[in-house]
Structure formats: structure tokens, C-alpha cells
Amino acid sequence: MSFLSIFTFFSVLISVARAVRFDLTNVTCKGLHGPHCGTYVMEVVGQNGTFLGQSTFVGADVLTESAGDAWARYLGQETRFLPKLTTIASNETKNFSPLIFTTNINTCNPQSIGDAMVPFANTVTGEIEYNSWADTADNASFITGLANQLFNSTDYGVQVASCYPNFASVILSTPTVNIFGKDDTLPDYCTAIQLKAVCPPEAGFD
């Protein structure tokens, strides 16, 4: 993959950081279907209380329409009404909710993430997106096995990074979460991150 940096907001040490394989055997949550199977949240290693999740915000088109039209869109559960930005943040961050990943009851391997929305990757920036219209974009690619890619990065030959690639992410003070090839040099607006499995109650999530 190649990544073109148009705007550079944050400069970090450029490195070819390789994520490690994550082992769920060191995590034991109470009340699960087996010693290590169940649901987990993903905490960023080295950043206590920072988790992988989604921030929601009201789009500009909603702010310019009538209250009646906006209410109808909300009741219709239109995904575009409240766009979701895949990001990392603390539990106390407003409009933020963690992504919950579920393990396979037989193998305990990461199986699925979050709700029923299908993740897509922007093939230009590598940004993970959950927008319902992402699959129709020319530069979108369906991500299979996203949970395993995030937790077993070495096996899948990818790096996971938090990035401030565009104006919106800086204004919202919220980084995007991007996937890069294992041999790619990260853009100077990205920082490599690693994730670990954490039991939701222990992390402060119900």
C-alpha cells in the first residue's frame, strides 16, 4: 500500500513497528462460557483506560434540515444521521462507546466485533470504517476477519495505528484507527498501537 500525506498535523518518530500476536489465555473474565471465552473490550497497550471504539457525531446535513426531517431520520435509524468514527478514547469520552468483540465458544478465537455493521477499509488511507455506504465507494475494501487482524497482527501481516489524517479528525480531537501492511513505514501523522483483551466490567463497562 502507498499512503499520500496531504496535510501533516502531528509528527511522530517514523518506524516500522510490528504488532505482536495477542494471547487470550492470560485473560479470565467471570461468567463466561468457558475460562477464556466470551466478550471483551480492546484496550490500547500502554495507555491505561484507552479503548478501541466508536465516536458518533451529527453530520452537517442534519444541522441544516428541519427538526421534523431530522426526527424522521433518527426514528428510521438511518446510519448517515449519526456517522460513526472508529477511534480510541477513554470510557469517560462523550459520544464514545467501546467496540465489543466476541470469541468463538469452541476455539476462543476472536470471532466478531461490535454490532451487525460490516467493517470496510479505505484502500487509500487504510482507515477502518463502519459507515453503511462504505461498500459503495470506489476506494473501499471489505475486511474479513477484522477481529483476528487486530489481535493477531503478525499472523495477518498488518500493523494497527492511530492517525490524525484529516481536518475532521483534528477538529474532533479524535484519531482514526488504520491498518497498514507489516512492512509499510507509517505516515508521520500515525502512531503504531497494540491492543489487549480486557474484561468489560473490569474496564468500567456494563
UniProtKB/Swiss-Prot annotation:
Stretch forming the signal peptide: 1-19
GO cellular component, one term: cytosol
Location within or outside the cell: Cytoplasm, Cytosol
Induction: In zinc-depleted conditions and has increased expression in NAP1 deletion mutants.
UniProt keyword list: Cytoplasm, Signal, Zinc
Keyword Oxidoreductase: no
Keyword Cytoplasm: yes
InterPro entries recorded: Vel1-like (IPR019435)
Similarity comment: family membership: Belongs to the VEL1 family.
Protein name (Swiss-Prot/TrEMBL): Protein VEL1
Recorded name of the encoding gene: VEL1
